[in-house]
Amino acid sequence: MYALIKTGGKQYKVAAGEKIKVEQIAADVGQEIVIDQVLAVGSGADLKVGTPLVAGATVKATVVAHGRHDKVRIFKMRRRKHYQKRQGHRQNFTELEISTVNG
């Protein structure tokens, strides 16, 4: 059984036992969270699509770790004007382990 969930402004396809990295969630490591924004639930050929959410569907996950992604480097330049700007960014993430998909 799999589900399409929405968290942090993004959508993820998840199944029980998978680990995913999502936008940072304010939860402690080891804490179990319940995601109720489930857009679709499927099992084999059977698929339930919500309008926009599937009623009563939930996904339970455990927070495994918090961390930061690799640095993304931004470089802006205007040719012939000697304008160069360098910038970097590291996005925070939360790693979740999906325990159950209900729906």
Curated annotation (Swiss-Prot):
Which keywords has UniProt assigned to this entry?
Ribonucleoprotein, Ribosomal protein, RNA-binding, rRNA-binding
The domain of life is: Bacteria
Q: Which GO terms describe its biological process?
A: translation
Q: Name one GO molecular function term.
A: rRNA binding
Q: Which InterPro entries match?
A: bL21-like, bL21-like_sf, Ribosomal_bL21, Ribosomal_bL21_CS
Task: Kindly give the PROSITE patterns that the UniProt entry links to this protein.
Answer: RIBOSOMAL_L21
* Keyword Aminoacyl-tRNA synthetase annotated: no
Query: According to its record, what are the GO cellular component terms?
Result: cytoplasm; ribonucleoprotein complex; ribosome
Quaternary structure annotation from Swiss-Prot or TrEMBL: Part of the 50S ribosomal subunit. Contacts protein L20.
- HAMAP family for this protein: Ribosomal_bL21
Q: What does this protein do?
A: This protein binds to 23S rRNA in the presence of protein L20.
Give the family, as the similarity comment puts it: Belongs to the bacterial ribosomal protein bL21 family.
Under what name is this protein listed? Answer: Large ribosomal subunit protein bL21
Specify the species.
Methylibium petroleiphilum (strain ATCC BAA-1232 / LMG 22953 / PM1)
Taxonomic lineage of the native organism: Bacteria, Pseudomonadati, Pseudomonadota, Betaproteobacteria, Burkholderiales
